[in-house]
Every structure is written in C-alpha cells, then in structure tokens.
C-alpha cells in the first residue's frame, strides 16, 4: 500500500480543500521533496495552469504553490548532485503539481541547496520572486552600473528583491511604495522612494529602466519616462493577454533555473540579500492565504506544510 500525505487542492469553485493523496514516487530524473514551507501567489487561482494542462485539456483539483523549501526524500534513477536529507529550495514547473502538500515531485534543474542562513520559511519566499527580479533586471533589461532604474512596488515580494539587486549592480534606484513602507524600501537600498498615493513618480525624471510589478494607469504613465533606448519590463499577470504591442514586448514570465538560484542563494549567506516574510500560516489555513485577505506590509505569505 502506498504511503499517504496531506495536501490542499483547488475545488471547482477555486477554493482550497484538504485531501489525502498517495505520496508521489519519483520517476527517472526526478526528486521527491518533503516540503517544509511553500510560497503563496494568490493570483494562482486564475492562472491558466490551474484550470488547464499544457495540451489545453481541462484540469481540476490542482495543488497550488510552485516555490518551496524542504528536504530531499527520494531520488529517481539517474539523479546526481543531491543526496537524501539535503536541504533544498526551488521552483516547480508551472504545469506540475504544486507544493502545498507534505511531499512534491520536482526536477534537479529546478532546485538549489538552501542557503544556510535562511530558515525553510524564509527560503520558501525566495525562488519565484528573486528569479523574477533577477531575470527581469539582468536578462531582459540588461541593467548596467550607473543607470537609473524605476521599480514600481518596491516593498512587494518581487519588488523588494529588485531593489536589492539593482542596488548591488550599482544603479541609481528609484522605487514606489505606500507611505508606510518608504523607510523599509530605503533600508533595502533605494536612493529615492515615492509614495505612490500622494507623490508623482514622473517628477523623478527620465530613467534607463523601468521594472513594473503593476499594470493599469501606473504602467500607462510610465512609458514617457524612458530615455532613448530605455527598457521597460512588466510582470503583472493581467498583462499576459494584452494586445498592446509595447506591453507584449515588455511582458515576461519567469523561468525555472536552478543554477541561477544557486548563484543568487550565496548572496543571502554573504549578507548581500535579505528575505522577508509577510506572514506564515499552517497548511490547514491555505484557503485563507489564497483569499488575499492576510494583512502585512511587505514580503511574501508562506504556508507551513510540516509541524517541524
């Protein structure tokens, strides 16, 4: 008889319900993870990957949560580089089952050793947000030392890493945030922080790069701030279906990359990067986590999947 595990799955009404499922078995080239913590992205409720498989057929009962931290609990044939008991963190394929469960399956290329300076709770807040910030600033926008960059949403789960990475690159960092988070974003390394409710970010002047974690009017007002040869990168999920040619060229979706994650993970142990958790909840309260009603000023919401 297969071992069983607790998990949370989406219902037809996109609420989350607790279920008991068999512990998955790693196939060749796969790793079984005993999950300790998982990051929450409330918009996952409406992602196409929640309701459809890669071939377009309808999908039900998906397990959410694609960034996680945990322990290697099983190795499929041919897997090298990891051993049972290794502490890891990673970012699963979008169409794979998520990690809001006691165990999940992933590929070695999606994983990295967990930074020793981070707890599992902290580490679970990192993979998607940090890789989004890194790939957006350095792969898509190719941010250079001395350039001026405007980061919309500097206190958000992605924005707080974008500010730290841009500062580390040697850019002049301008960020927007709520009034309550201005001091926090300055401590991350921003040179200027603008209250998005009361201030006008246009007054900061022309910039080389804009990193937009938001859409709507804020994005519409941003284009005119770009210098000649300026670059805008947009990550807001609602932009995926945009027909605006400018938006289509600016929008990108982060990709799994264990090597990038391993390289960036060293920056936590050196003190160059810091992770921030907005709140943590037990797995039984996952539906509340995905409701978007959990208060907190900055960082990512985390679900604990074990009691350890």
Regions found by a protein language model. Give the residues of each.
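Glycine-rich phosphate-binding loop and adjacent beta-alpha segment
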Residues: 214-276, 305-308
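Glycine-rich beta-strand-centered segment in the early N-terminal region that forms part
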Residues: 22-39, 51-95
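Short, polar loop motifs at secondary-structure junctions
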Residues: 177-181, 197-199, 234-241
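NAD(P)H dinucleotide-binding glycine-rich loop of Rossmann-like/cofactor-binding domains
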Residues: 81, 91-153
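Mid-domain Rossmann-like dinucleotide-binding core that forms the NAD(H)/NADP(H) cofactor-binding site
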Residues: 84, 126-195
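Short acidic-hydrophobic, aromatic-tinged amphipathic segments that line or gate anion-handling sites
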Residues: 192-197, 281-284
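A short acidic, Gly/Pro-enriched loop at the edge of an enzyme's catalytic core
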Residues: 202-209
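C-terminal hydrophobic helical "lid"/dimerization subdomain
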Residues: 2-3, 261-308
């Amino acid at each position: 008889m297969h071992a069983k595990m607790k998990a949370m799955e989406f219902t037809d009404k996109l609420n989350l319900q607790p279920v008991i499922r068999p512990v998955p078995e790693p196939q060749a080239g796969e790793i079984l993870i005993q999950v300790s913590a998982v990051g929450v992205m409330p918009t996952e409720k409406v992602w196409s990957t929640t309701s459809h498989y890669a071939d377009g057929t309808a999908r039900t009962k998906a397990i959410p949560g694609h960034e996680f931290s945990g322990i290697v609990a099983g190795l499929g044939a041919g897997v090298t580089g990891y051993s049972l008991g290794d502490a890891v963190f990673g970012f699963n394929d979008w169409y794979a089952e998520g990690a809001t469960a006691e165990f999940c399956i992933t590929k070695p290329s999606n994983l990295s050793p967990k930074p020793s300076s981070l707890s599992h709770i902290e580490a679970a807040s990192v993979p998607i947000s940090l890789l989004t910030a890194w790939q957006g600033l350095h792969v898509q926008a190719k941010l250079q030392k001395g350039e001026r960059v405007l980061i919309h949403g500097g206190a958000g789960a992605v924005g707080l890493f974008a500010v730290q990475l841009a500062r580390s690159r040697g850019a002049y960092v301008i960020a927007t945030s709520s009034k309550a988070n201005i001091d926090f974003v300055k401590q991350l390394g921003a040179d200027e922080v603008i209250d998005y409710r009361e201030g006008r970010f246009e007054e900061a002047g022309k910039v080389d790069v804009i990193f937009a974690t938001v859409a709507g009017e804020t994005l519409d007002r941003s284009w005119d701030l770009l210098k000649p040869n300026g670059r805008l990168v947009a990550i807001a999920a609602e932009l995926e279906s945009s027909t605006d040619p400018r938006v289509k060229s600016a929008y990108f979706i982060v990709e799994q990359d264990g090597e990038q994650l391993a390289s960036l993970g060293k920056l936590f142990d050196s003190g160059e990067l810091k992770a921030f958790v907005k709140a943590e909840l037990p797995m039984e309260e996952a539906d509340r986590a995905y409701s978007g009603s959990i208060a907190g000023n900055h960082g990512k919401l985390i679900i604990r999947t074990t009691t350890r």
